[in-house]
Amino acid sequence: MQFEDWQTAPDPKVIWKEKQKARELRKTQWWKNRRACNSCYYCESPTPAKKLTMDHVVPLARGGSNIKSNLVPCCKSCNNQKKNLLPIEWKEYLAIIGKKKE
């Protein structure tokens, strides 16, 4: 985390509320439909719907929210590796390790 990120980091209470919203969204038909693709948004590997996790494209810790356009299904491996990276940082990482998301 850069010093500039620390200055603008979201309030922990805001992050907690957003995580609560995400838990509720996981129970919705909308999320079930999103997982029905049975593949990871990032690496495109075939993944059973029940094993797909919810990822914030722009992480909560970097100012993201639970708007539906910011939530994607991804495999645990990608979610664990992506952590708090922004989309451009994640694409650079994927290019380095040889996995591409066009």
What is each residue range found by the language model?
Residues 2-42:
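Short, charged surface segments at domain edges that flank catalytic/cofactor-binding sites
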Residues 38, 52, 69, 73:
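Cys/His-enriched microdomains
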Residues 53-59:
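Histidine-centered catalytic micro-motifs used for acid/base chemistry in nuclease
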Residues 49-50, 81-85:
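Short, non-ligating residues that shape and space the ligands of small metal-coordination modules
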Residues 63-81:
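Short beta-strand-alpha-helix junction that forms the catalytic/metal-binding core
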Residues 99-102:
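Short acidic DE-rich linear segments
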